Amino acid sequence: MSNRTPLPVPNAKESQLPTLAQYNPKVDLVEVRRDPQKYPRISATPLADAVAQMTPIVYGAALYRGQEMGAAQVRFIANALVSEILADTKFGLRSLSWMEIGMVIRNAVLGGAKEMYGVSVATLYSALVDYAKTEGHDAQTKAYQPK
């Protein structure tokens, strides 16, 4: 048993926090890409709010993975992951919505296409890049094709 304290709840509004259970798998990714007001993008979120919203996603990923993490480690991974995503100019990760980020991380942790050895900045970032190259790219292309 460990003596670690439970993770504190972030200061962001509860309704805005995208948890791993909140995403709707029936929503078409093309619809998500077409409607940035309904599905806000990470690039449109202020840095402090983005870290606060990423924290429960990372914490949920650690719980799903069965990996024990303290609050400081979760905040570190969330902060580093947000910084990496916002600095990305090659793969288009800045245009991902919070719903997509939660979905991708959940699928990666629960046994997606690649083997995931633990929850870290590198593994979560790798899952997001793989998504952006495949499904995300296809959804982006279809979203902006003329009808």
Name these PLM-found stretches:
Residues 1-147:
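Charged interaction scaffolds used for protein-protein
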